Swiss-Prot record:
This is DNA-binding protein VNG_2008H. GO terms for cellular component: cytosol. It comes from the Archaea. HAMAP family: dsDNA_bind. InterPro entries: DNA_bind_arc, PDCD5-like, PDCD5-like_sf. Keywords: DNA-binding. Residues 11-21 have a biased composition (Basic and acidic residues). Residues 1-59 are annotated as: Disordered.
Length: 117
């Protein structure tokens, strides 16, 4: 470089800092990738349990709900999994049982009557 020892030292420190930042970024990417893989495995396990515990009709109903109300479908899935894990369901949940579960989870909606004079 310019031959000045301070400049050379400063350049060396910059290079070290760049290397540290690269290593930190690569470590963060690996950690993020591991988290994504874990989430994907959890989702696959959940889907396998749902497939095991729901009939085709009940699964179709749940998928239809997921398209319009994803949060509500997630809540229903959690309820189905909890019922299955606790052993409160014998066999598979059919469409009628799924309707009942959805009715229980559905928030009470208030209806308003408007009277015109």
């Amino acid at each position: 470089m310019s031959g000045n020892p301070d400049d050379d030292r400063l350049e060396e420190l910059r290079q070290r800092k760049k290397e540290q930042l690269k290593q930190q970024q690569q470590g963060g990417d690996a950690e993020r990738e591991a988290q994504q893989q874990q989430a994907q495995q959890a989702e696959q396990q959940k889907q396998a349990m749902l497939k095991q515990n729901l009939t085709d009709g009940a699964r179709k109903r749940l998928n239809t709900i997921r398209m319009s109300k994803p949060e509500f479908a997630e809540q229903a899935e959690q309820q189905v999994l909890a019922l299955a894990q606790s052993g409160r369901v014998q066999g598979r949940i059919d469409e009628d049982q799924m309707k009942e579960i959805l009715r229980e989870l559905k928030p009470d909606s208030q209806s308003f009557n408007i009277n015109r004079r």
